[in-house]
Structures are given as C-alpha cells and as structure tokens.
Amino acid sequence: MLIRPYQPSDWDATYQVCLETGDSGLDAKHLHTDPKALGNIYVGAYLRFEPELAYVLEDEQGVCGYVLGALDSKRFYERYLREWLPPLQQTHAKPTGDRSKWNPSAQLHALLFEPEMVYQPKLVNWPAHLHIDLIARAQGKGWGKQMIDRLLADLIERKSSGVHLGVSTRNDRAIGFYQKMGFAEIMRDGPADDGTIYMARGLP
C-alpha cells in the first residue's frame, strides 16, 4: 500500500471510500439510494478547498482510504456554507414530510439545507481539523496512524497550534484509535447513543 497526495482523478474513489465506511466505519452502500450523499457532506468540500491537505491510501485494487484536513476550521466552514452548499441545494430536493420516515440519503440531503457541519467556537484552541476513513481491507494494519502522522506534519509545517476531529459516539473502535494518537475528548453534541464526540490534540 502507498500513501500519496490526492489527485483530482481520485475524486470518485474518495467518495466511494466515504460510502463504504459511512455506517460508523462499516459499509453503508445498502443504506443509501444516493451513493454520493455521504461524500457531498463529508468529503467534497475538503477536496475542493484544500486539496493540498488531502492524502489517499492506495493498493493494487485502488484507493482504499483517505485523510482530509482543514487548516482553519472557521474559514473552512464559512466557505462550506457560502460556496459548497448552494450549488448542491440547486440540484437536490429538500426532503419534506415526516422526518422519522426519511431514508439515510434523505437525511443527508436535508443537511444540504440545514447543515450540522458548522464551526464550533469551543474548539478555537485547536483550529485545524481532520477527517479520515479506511475501508475494511486497509484497517488494522497501521496505515491510519501513518496517514494522520503525514497530515499532522503538514499542519505543523503550516504553524497550526492544534487539531480536532469528530467521531460518532457509536464508533468505539475509532474512539480508541484516536486516543492512542493523542486525541482527548473536548465536548459532545447530539444524543448520547447517536451523537458526535469532538476530540483534539495540540501541535506539535
């Protein structure tokens, strides 16, 4: 396997990795009628705005993981709201009716109009953030640590004072992994059984 900088030709493959890890780290293909719904929320803006902070993991079968970074989270989310979402709002219908009956893709389409990915002022001391996903065949082999280390080196070179990330409260494996990488819990958001834990660490 090889860690290399993201290239524009990797766009579709990174979206596919997001889909194959979109159920708290497990494959979510069976859950979604729109295979791009997850990537539109969690991947595309990073590739568009800060491709220099994106790396992919590749083996003989193709791209099997990625790590994405944003140097200044406040600025990133401002651009996310101002530049990324409006074109998607033009090409997707806002879900209506009983929210409890929406399928997973509809729930994500709703986030195009009522975004949850917004700047968290409580994380101001850790201004950068990252997002990493590896599909099953790439997990448990140490590649996740290497990819995060690569991105952290970039953030340190750019004088970042700290970095944070969000992880599902249901993803115990990922939480343990991030703790081993030096991340500590800062805050929680949403319901206890299906919310987000924000973890952070200082740099360097």
Q: What feature does the model see in each segment?
A:
Residues 2-16:
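A short beta-loop-alpha structural element at the N-terminal edge
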Residues 125, 130, 141, 145-146, ...:
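Conserved active-site alpha-helix within GNAT-family acetyltransferase domains
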Residues 23-42, 79-93, 97:
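Conserved GNAT-fold acetyl-CoA-binding loop/helix
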Residues 74, 164-166, 179-199:
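Conserved catalytic-core motifs of GNAT/GCN5-like acyltransferases
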Residues 126-128, 155-168:
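Conserved GNAT acetyl-CoA-binding A-motif
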Residues 21, 32-54, 60, 115:
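Active-site rim helix/loop that mediates acceptor-substrate recognition in acyltransferases
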Residues 56, 62-71:
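Conserved beta-strand in the GNAT
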Residues 74-131:
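Conserved acyl-donor/pantetheine-binding loop and adjacent beta-alpha core of acyl/acetyltransferases
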